[in-house]
Amino acid sequence: MAKKSMIEREKKRLKFVTKFKQKRYDLKKQIKKAEFLEEKLSLYAKLQKLPRNSSAVRLHNRCLISGRPKGYYRDFGLSRHVLREFGHNCLLPGLTKSSW
């Protein structure tokens, strides 16, 4: 189980990303359209003044149940440990254990 503070930190980052997504997108669009170097530099400065956690790159996928950051399956939103446990208990519809 991950520390609660780490899970909360990720939730906070997700809120920041959604809050500043449009502003970030508009600034990047303006930078691409800018013709002069001075104009681009001023737009880059505005982009850098946005909070660090508002960048989507800083997000990390975590398991919804345990908060584990590694061994994450995107399709289910679970880590490999929880996925295996849920699969054995038939809690994931459509998931079958393979045998050959």
UniProtKB/Swiss-Prot annotation:
SUPFAM superfamilies xref list: Glucocorticoid receptor-like (DNA-binding domain)
Listed GO biological process terms: translation
Subcellular compartments: Plastid, Chloroplast
The entry's keywords: Chloroplast, Plastid, Ribonucleoprotein, Ribosomal protein, RNA-binding, rRNA-binding
Pfam families per record: Ribosomal_S14 (PF00253)
Main location, first listed in the record: plastid
GO molecular function term, any single one: rRNA binding
Superkingdom to which the source organism belongs: Eukaryota
Assembly notes: Part of the 30S ribosomal subunit.
Protein name, entry field: Small ribosomal subunit protein uS14c
